[in-house]
Amino acid sequence: MKRIKCLLHSFAAFLFTGIAASFFVQTLVSCSNDPVLVNPEGFAGSIGGKETGLWTISNGDMVLQATNYGGRVVSLWVPEGNGEMVDVVLGHGTLDEYVNYRRERFLGAVVGPVANRIVGASYSHDGRTYRLSANHNGTGTLHGGFRGLDSVVWDFVSQTDSSLTFHCLHPDGAEGFPGNLDILMTYTLTSDCTWKIDYLATTDAVRPVNISNHPYFNLGGEGSGTCGDYVLWVNADSFLGTDGPDVIETPILVEGTAFDYRTPHLVRDALESGDPQIVRSNGGFDHNFCINGEGMREAASLYNPSNGILLSVWTDQPGLQLYSGQWWTGEERGKNGKSLDRFGSFTFETQNWPDAPNKPSFPNPFLEPGETYTHHCEYRFRIME
């Protein structure tokens, strides 16, 4: 592969107790190493009579590989401050590992048709109650049930040098959801080192829709250590707490809690806080933040001081699920044979609020015939100097 010329934006300044400077300095970096790509042969096969594969796209600055099994992102190479490329997402090197390794079935996948939790594995709408698959502790529905969007083979639609489009039909009655849900998803790499995700969906019956993506980020590369010393910022005045299997209906103000990241500070500050919500979630984040504002806006950012990479998350959705990888044990291995350690990754899942079908005060999750569901998400990568 030819050397990759990376046009990067770097922050002119960043205050660890304040806000990033509002202007950028453009820097042209010649990356000194080529990405070590996953071999597509490990993904060639079929599941349920549908062919599987691995596709590679690049914009000259970044390289992304994705499989149509669950629409998963397998690798994402971006430039770091020393002029080299680094793969910043966790993944596996073969299809078999994704299909048969079930400890973390959502690794890099599209999740839905209703991401996150539906408490009680049921919801009522227009006087009718819908019973769903109870795949979460036997009492709730998580990420669409036993066979969600992560566990099916998507149809390949089209590819350009820098974009890839998949299609999926979630059929009427699957996992208990009514109506046929027709979904298009496009991954795009833009010229400013951004990975864009766009979802479009239509239905022939009223049903809840909340599609998201589940990439695990380690900005130093898979197996490079924990994210505790990363600097986190979240654009949220409140978050949703949990109470056992339930999602607390009234948002909790972040003021005075371990969840207040309106000013950037270390991830480990929350992990070591002893906050009851953190303790209840095995010592880490697994919570929905109620993002301030509407429309396309910045929801959160994560900075790795060791290599200068800043990841900024933008979305038009009302919520952002933060998960700090506390359920990894170190016994698992990723695509490079390195251990997947506790707190060794971070997910930002742009979404509607969890359990919205059961909570009328939450943003409306229901899609009706004749309407189009849209969801836009951007992961923007920059180098800070």
Q: Could you say what each language-model-derived stretch is?
A:
Residues 11-27:
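Bacterial N-terminal signal peptides
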Residues 32-385:
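An exposed, glycine/acidic-rich loop-and-rim segment of catalytic or binding clefts
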Residues 1-9:
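N-terminal secretory signal peptides that target proteins for export/translocation
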